[in-house]
């Protein structure tokens, strides 16, 4: 491959969005893309296209005095920034260095200490609760404790300075945790809801701690829905105080103590999210108001007005009239991770990487891009990947990086949530957006930003695999329902715009982890995140008629859940989540080959067919399968892609492969001798 000088000059730009932010978000990257042969031989060429997606991704924010503290997301190392509102500059930061994201921030009543709780992919045996002394911001935050629940999702500090934490770990019901700053001890106070899978909200008064849980992740299979418990600090006992109207929602999402009231919100699923205001003196006395959003979070208050964020923007709730109203804002706020009401103004922190200072009375706002203000713009872990002859796309949090394959220019596009998987058809990008965002699209010839193409039932919230069916001109998307269990197959016609959601096409427990297509038939690979029930079922499905054609149960050694599927000729290739490999002859509907590839593929994987060869990628290795013997060969060893939610590989129309090596996007041109 011959490189031009333009390929050596890579620029990272922020695409002009609804807020008109189009300034450079990072320094020039002058290192040229490198092509080199690998151990697989001279027929394999790897081109480094630079960082997949660079931004200051964030997951939490809290205003203390005149400074907003912001927790990072999927960046290494984890850190908290201090954004000074009067100067609109990042004036300090502290590196925590543990985990991948910071979702929980809370300040003690004096405003001196900021507590931060982290999320981890695996228990590192290190503190997951940190404290930063804001009087000496030049000194780093220190780890002060570790809960046995791996992830901390929310923190609250009682008036006496005692810290309470909630969160969870897969396979275990969440507990309420207490950190005593006087003794330095972390204590488990109990598990109030043994059927909950995650706790996301906590609030505390002098006498009571409120614990909000449910099953935002890992729903179904008997998991509980939204639950609210009051913990008596003196007696050490829990009491269920969940408003009955909220019990259908999958989870309590947020809690706020305002004077003598407790404000409670939920995440919605089959119904919209709800907001309740409860009397602290008599928790059976409350007002409850449905919203139009899928989630209500980031509760804050000014006098009798409660402000909150939903998936559609900002809203206010009047305690006097019990009326919810939108808060005017000229632009797209995206996914909101911080909201504070101070002095009649709102401070909004968006997942798009900006801080907005908003006057709710007039709708006027001042918006500051965090990259321009001094936040580090660095590579984050990646999600879906797609490419054509001109552009390659890498999904991230609240953004998609567009790589110009001719010039090397990289532009960050705005898209709320997460682009879990994507495809490019005739130059147009199509994505499956988590959570409950449906399908989005972007046409570079038309410019602008990505926009929603089609919505689907909100409970079918997690798209996992996007596939194109050229026979029926359909986009096929395999989906998981985090809250209800099971999943669905979405279809969208690129010709007519018609859409459909086929709920639980495998069974009531299995989600659709993978989708492949041949001759107008969709092949669905099942997976089951629960401990019970079948997993790994393969279903042949007519996506036009919306009906099953036949199904196949895999051999017992392969029933660990499907990770990926691909079709070559009459053969359906499949990988399981523990490295099991199988080939199905679609003409006789039978497994004709199996193998154990745990050595190179110990967990999640992705596959794609390119130039008549099926390729796969794991967390560690890019590999191919021989089309006649099905033997596995390594293409790129130790590729070690930095993925947020499982590896991806895709191909452009010329058959070149795109995946991640570390946090960099790479193009792999492989011409094996078959």
PLM ranges: what are they?
Residues 49-54, 94-98, 144-148, 190-194, ...:
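Surface loop/turn motifs at the tips and blade-to-blade linkers of beta-strand repeat domains
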Residues 55-60, 99-106, 149-156, 196-203, ...:
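Repeated scaffold domains used in trafficking and secretory/extracellular systems
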Residues 643-674:
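Blade-level signature of beta-propeller repeat domains, shared across WD40, Kelch, NHL, RCC1
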Residues 49-78:
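Beta-strand-rich domains and repeat architectures in extracellular enzymes and scaffolds
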Residues 1-7, 15-34:
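N-terminal secretory signal peptides
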Residues 38-54:
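A short helix->beta-strand "capping" segment at the edge of beta-propeller domains
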Residues 74, 120, 169-170, 214-217, ...:
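Residue-level signature of beta-propeller blades and closely related beta-rich strand-turn architectures
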Residues 77-81, 124-130, 172-177, 219-227, ...:
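Structural motif
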């Amino acid at each position: 491959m011959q490189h031009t000088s333009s390929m050596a000059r890579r620029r990272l730009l922020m695409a002009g969005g609804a807020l008109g932010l189009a300034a450079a978000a990072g320094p020039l990257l002058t290192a040229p893309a490198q092509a080199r042969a690998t151990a697989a031989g001279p027929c394999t060429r790897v081109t480094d296209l630079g960082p997949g997606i660079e931004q200051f991704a964030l997951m939490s924010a809290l205003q203390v005095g005149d400074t907003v503290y912001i927790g990072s997301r999927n960046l290494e190392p984890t850190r908290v920034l201090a954004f000074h509102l009067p100067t609109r500059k990042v004036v300090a930061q502290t590196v925590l260095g543990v985990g991948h994201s910071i979702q929980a921030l809370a300040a003690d009543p004096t405003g001196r200490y900021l507590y931060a709780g982290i999320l981890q992919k695996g228990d590192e045996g290190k503190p997951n609760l940190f404290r930063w002394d804001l009087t000496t911001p030049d000194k780093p935050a220190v780890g002060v404790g570790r809960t046995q629940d791996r992830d901390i999702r929310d923190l609250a500090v009682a008036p006496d300075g005692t810290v309470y934490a909630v969160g969870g770990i897969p396979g275990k019901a969440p507990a309420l945790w207490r950190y005593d700053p006087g003794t330095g001890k972390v204590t488990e106070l109990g598990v109030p809801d043994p059927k909950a899978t995650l706790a996301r909200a906590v609030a505390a008064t002098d006498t009571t701690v409120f614990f909000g849980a449910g099953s935002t992740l890992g729903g179904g299979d008997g998991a509980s829905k939204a639950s609210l418990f009051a913990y008596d600090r003196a007696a050490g006992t829990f009491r269920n105080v969940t408003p009955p109207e909220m019990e259908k929602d999958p989870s309590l999402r947020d809690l706020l103590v305002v004077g003598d009231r407790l404000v409670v919100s939920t995440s919605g699923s089959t119904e919209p999210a709800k907001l309740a205001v409860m009397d602290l003196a008599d928790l059976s006395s409350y007002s409850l108001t449905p919203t139009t959003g899928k989630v209500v979070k980031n509760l804050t208050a000014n006098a009798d007005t409660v402000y909150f964020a939903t998936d559609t923007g900002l809203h206010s709730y009047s305690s006097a009239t019990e009326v919810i109203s939108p808060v005017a804002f000229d632009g797209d706020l995206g996914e909101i991770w911080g909201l504070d009401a101070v002095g009649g103004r709102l401070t909004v922190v968006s997942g798009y990487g900006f801080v907005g200072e908003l006057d709710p009375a007039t709708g006027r706002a001042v918006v500051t891009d965090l990259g321009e203000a001094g936040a580090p713009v660095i590579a984050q872990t990646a999600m879906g990947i797609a490419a054509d002859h001109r552009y390659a796309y890498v999904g991230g949090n609240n953004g998609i990086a567009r790589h110009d394959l001719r010039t090397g220019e990289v532009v960050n596009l705005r898209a709320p949530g997460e682009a879990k998987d994507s495809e490019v058809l005739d130059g147009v990008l199509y994505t499956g957006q988590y959570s409950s965002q449906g399908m989005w699209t972007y046409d570079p010839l038309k410019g602008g930003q990505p926009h929603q193409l089609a919505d689907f039932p909100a409970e079918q919230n997690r798209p996992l695999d996007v596939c194109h069916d050229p026979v029926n001109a359909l986009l096929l998307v395999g989906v998981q329902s985090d809250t209800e269990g099971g999943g669905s197959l979405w279809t969208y016609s690129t010709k007519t715009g018609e859409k459909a959601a086929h709920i639980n096409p495998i069974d009531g427990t299995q989600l659709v982890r993978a989708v492949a297509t041949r001759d107008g038939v969709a092949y669905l690979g099942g997976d089951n995140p629960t401990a019970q029930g079948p997993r790994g079922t393969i279903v042949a499905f007519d996506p036009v008629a919306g009906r099953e054609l036949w199904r196949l149960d895999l051999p017992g050694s392969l029933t660990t859940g499907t990770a990926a599927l691909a079709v070559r000729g009459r053969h359906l290739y499949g990988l399981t989540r523990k490295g099991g490999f199988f080939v199905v002859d679609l003409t006789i509907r039978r497994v004709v080959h199996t193998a154990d590839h745990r050595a190179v593929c110990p967990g999640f994987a992705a596959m794609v067919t390119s130039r008549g060869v099926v390729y796969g990628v794991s967390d560690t290795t890019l590999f191919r399968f021989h089309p006649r013997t099905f033997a596995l060969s390594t293409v790129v060893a130790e590729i070690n892609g930095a993925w947020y939610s499982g590896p991806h590989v895709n191909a452009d129309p010329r058959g070149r492969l795109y995946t991640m090596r570390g946090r960099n996007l790479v193009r792999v041109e492989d011409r094996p001798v078959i």
